[in-house]
């Protein structure tokens, strides 16, 4: 039974799931918009919002936490410079998920996740 199970497992072990979410988060912050499956987009939303909230905080501890999660150091630097001006007045809801056509090979539900 699935009672009180809070983590979407994405059919992967914990270390692979963590690596997948780190890479998807890095690419979404780098490009601003990516196409992925709907479930991955929904799980990715919470991770990206955490990183943007850290960047809004702007402290040294928040920067170090972001550096431990996002792969690219220059990307973290750019994130911490741009986010306070871009999302300064917004209290959450930094991403948007748009449903698209299913994937051709296996008919998986696809979505575009983008930064607002």
Swiss-Prot record:
Its GO CC terms are: cytosolic large ribosomal subunit
What is the superkingdom listed in this entry's lineage? Bacteria
Which Pfam families has this protein been placed in? Ribosomal_L17
Under the GO molecular function aspect, what terms does this record hold? Answer: structural constituent of ribosome
Record-level GO BP terms? translation
Alphabetically list the UniProt keywords: Ribonucleoprotein, Ribosomal protein
Under HAMAP family, the record lists:
Ribosomal_bL17
Q: How does it assemble?
A: Part of the 50S ribosomal subunit. Contacts protein L32.
Query: What PANTHER family has UniProt attached to this entry?
Result: LARGE RIBOSOMAL SUBUNIT PROTEIN BL17M, RIBOSOMAL PROTEIN L17
Which family would the database say this protein is a member of?
A: Belongs to the bacterial ribosomal protein bL17 family.
**Protein name stated in the entry:** Large ribosomal subunit protein bL17
Organism in which the protein naturally occurs: Nostoc punctiforme (strain ATCC 29133 / PCC 73102)
């Amino acid at each position: 039974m699935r009672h009180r199970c809070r983590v979407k497992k994405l059919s992967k072990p914990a270390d692979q799931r963590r690596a997948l979410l780190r890479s998807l988060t890095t690419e979404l912050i780098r490009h601003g918009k990516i196409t992925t499956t709907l479930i991955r987009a929904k799980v990715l939303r919470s991770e990206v919002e955490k990183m943007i909230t850290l960047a809004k905080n702007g402290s040294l501890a928040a920067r170090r936490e972001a550096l431990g999660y996002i792969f690219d150091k220059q990307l973290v630097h750019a994130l911490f410079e741009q986010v306070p001006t871009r999302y300064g007045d917004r209290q959450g809801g930094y991403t948007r998920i748009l449903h698209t056509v299913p994937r051709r090979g296996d008919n998986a539900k696809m979505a575009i996740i983008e930064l607002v």
